[in-house]
Curated annotation (Swiss-Prot):
One of its GO terms (biological process) is L-leucine biosynthetic process. It comes from Streptococcus gordonii (strain Challis / ATCC 35105 / BCRC 15272 / CH1 / DL1 / V288). Binds 1 [4Fe-4S] cluster per subunit. Belongs to the aconitase/IPM isomerase family. LeuC type 1 subfamily. Its cofactor is [4Fe-4S] cluster. PROSITE patterns: ACONITASE_1, ACONITASE_2. Its EC number is 4.2.1.33. This is 3-isopropylmalate dehydratase large subunit.
């Protein structure tokens, strides 16, 4: 009998009823919520006279609509209504939350792990497509819609069809200047944004094992851009060390770890598809188009037009085949988002700007992903490094990742961004987004354009 993958083992633990191949009722261990996808779900409960079944397994935070200059100066009527409504709802339904402006507040996919609520073995959902981030801990984690949010509120369960399994093996040692963001951007550039559709993607290989937990979260975060709503990794000692000592960590930690050690893929586990990538052959990545698969290694020319999507992307981005990333005149730099706003991301970016100054006529902002990250970064002096270099140092929030708050890229301006999506108008109407690592974004802020960070002393 064939072995089982970590996903198989976790799925079996959480099935309540139903046959494989058909929708199965799954038990939810942890439900994260934020202000945008929860209001209608709460109203549905009120209309039906229901309560939240397990408020103790639900946790809320404020992130999408939060201003990052003055977090209380919410001028957009809809944004203010959503934030006020979540404040009211978590109080009325007895849900633990990181209050707006509190010492825990931040992006939901950062706050969850930081509180220790994200753990190996859990089945986690949230009304946000980047919930796969939590899969880096050895958890099943995926985004759900608002009607499903209401269903989880009422029942602590969700109906799901078990997906196929894909194994992506990253092997080798990455060259200097290549980071986990480049791993996932390279995967998407090679195989496309639909390659993972219908699959859970397990990321494995020695290159993954050598990554920190924060670097692993970056990869799982962008599973949805690969077409899969779930990404997962085997937990190991790094995982246990990350969780230990946090407020939400299991009280009997040794017993928990003993259990978690059984939740790894068997050597003979079977997958529906296997992809292998040698990271020693990778280079820093930059996207040129309007979806994450439209990316190239630094130094490579942008491809010829292959279809109408390419033509539209080139027209929107005001670029053309044959040009290179270094030819782009950048106007904005954004270092932040649930992909790359963790402490290690900020430390990495700071290395490239220390003692320097951003290029003229360029706006650069750094948005720590959570209040705890901001607090520690400031103790380390990172805020001063960035501000001395001409960056704006902001309060936590989703910020410029998406145009749902005051942080927007102006029409027609090219932005080097550490976020996860480069769709048309994603960062503001007419904004032209180029996805890259924190190192590439920081170095670009100094030069005013993308540069080959492999040649810089900061990576030597």
């Amino acid at each position: 009998m064939a072995g089982k993958s970590i996903f198989d083992k976790l799925w079996e633990r959480h099935v309540i009823t139903g046959q494989e191949g058909q929708p199965q009722l799954m038990y939810v261990d942890q439900h994260y919520i934020h202000e945008v996808t929860s209001p209608q779900a709460f109203q549905g409960l009120r209309d039906a006279g229901r309560k939240v079944r397990r408020p103790d397994l639900t946790f809320g935070t404020f992130d999408h609509n939060v201003p990052t200059v003055n977090i209380y100066d919410i001028r957009d009527v809809i944004s203010k209504a959503q934030i006020d409504k979540l404040s009211e709802n978590v109080k009325d339904f007895g849900i633990e939350h990181a209050a707006h402006g509190s010492e825990l507040q931040g992006i939901v996919h950062m706050v969850g792990p930081e509180t220790g609520k994200t753990q190996p073995g859990k089945f986690i959902v949230c009304g946000d497509s980047h919930t796969a981030t939590h899969g880096a801990f050895g958890a099943i984690a995926f985004g759900i819609g608002t009607s499903e949010v209401e269903h989880v509120f009422a029942t602590q369960t969700i109906w799901q069809v078990k997906p196929k399994k894909m194994l992506v093996k990253f092997t080798g040692v990455p060259p200097k200047g290549v980071y986990s963001k480049d791993f996932i951007l390279a995967l998407i550039a090679r195989y496309g944004v639909a390659a993972g559709v219908g699959h859970v993607v397990e990321y494995a290989g020695d290159a993954i094992e050598h990554l920190t937990m924060e670097e692993r979260m970056t990869i799982c975060n962008m599973s949805i851009e690969f077409g899969s709503k779930m990404g997962i990794m085997n937990p190991d000692q790094k995982t246990y060390d990350y969780v230990q000592g946090r407020p939400g960590a299991p009280k009997d930690f040794e017993a928990a770890v003993a259990d978690w050690k059984t939740l790894v893929s068997d050597p003979d586990a079977v997958y529906d598809k296997v992809i292998e990538i040698d990271v020693s052959q990778l280079a820093p990545m930059v996207t040129w188009g309007t979806n994450p698969s439209m990316g190239v290694e630094f130094g490579a020319a942008f491809p010829e037009i292959r279809d109408m999507n390419d033509e539209r992307a080139y027209n929107y981005m005001d670029l053309s085949p044959g040009k290179k990333a270094e030819d782009i005149d950048l106007g904005y730099i954004f270092i932040g988002s649930c992909t790359n706003a963790r402490l290690s991301d900020l430390q990495l970016a700071a290395k490239f700007v220390a003692g320097k100054h951003i290029a003229p006529n360029l706006t650069a902002i750094v948005v720590p992903g959570s209040r705890p990250v901001k607090r520690v970064a400031e103790k380390m002096g990172l805020d001063k490094i960035f501000m001395d270099a001409g960056f704006e140092w902001r309060d936590p929030g989703c910020s410029m990742c998406l145009g749902m708050n005051p942080d927007k890229v102006p029409d027609g301006v090219h932005c080097a961004s550490t976020s996860n999506r480069n769709f048309e108008d994603r960062q503001g109407f007419g904004a032209k987004t180029h996805l890259c690592s924190p190192a590439m974004a920081a170095a670009a802020a100094i030069a005013g354009r993308f540069v080959d960070i492999r040649q810089l002393p900061e990576v030597q």
